Amino acid sequence: LKPVDSHGKALTCDNAGCENTDFDWPWMQHAASLTSRGTLIVFDNGDARHLEQPALPTMKYSRGVEYRINEKDMTVQQVWEYGKDRGFAWYAPVTGNIRYDGSKDVMQIFASSTGIFDKSKKAIESTFDVIDYKTKKIELEMKIKMMGKKNMPYRAEKIDPKIAF
């Protein structure tokens, strides 16, 4: 797939990323799924981004990201992302997931393994966020503290009890 901008213009990319754009491929991704809009969303763990490690571990980040793929033209456009600005505090190197809820126009993102490499923390503290799709404002944020560093959460989903039971 060839990365393109919002106008369909090809981007100049290599292993170090793409020039003059926020487009990036996912690195160590989890939970890829198609949305009701036909886009692809993934939780981008972000480890080994651009096939290398940053100078400082605290420069790592994870994100939820959405792509529009045109199979006919073999192009991919990044249309949405969240998490990059939250930096290392929201970095989940091992697992995580993302879901789009079209009924509320929100993304549900679970950064599941945050703090796993922070030696000052005795437990993993996962973060489940519900993000307004248009504004990227956090509508709900839950911190989930595990019993220790050996208890690794995998995924979290917001469910509607009326439908689930």
Task: List where the protein language model places each region.
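Histidine-/acidic-rich catalytic cores in large beta-rich domains
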Residues: 1-165
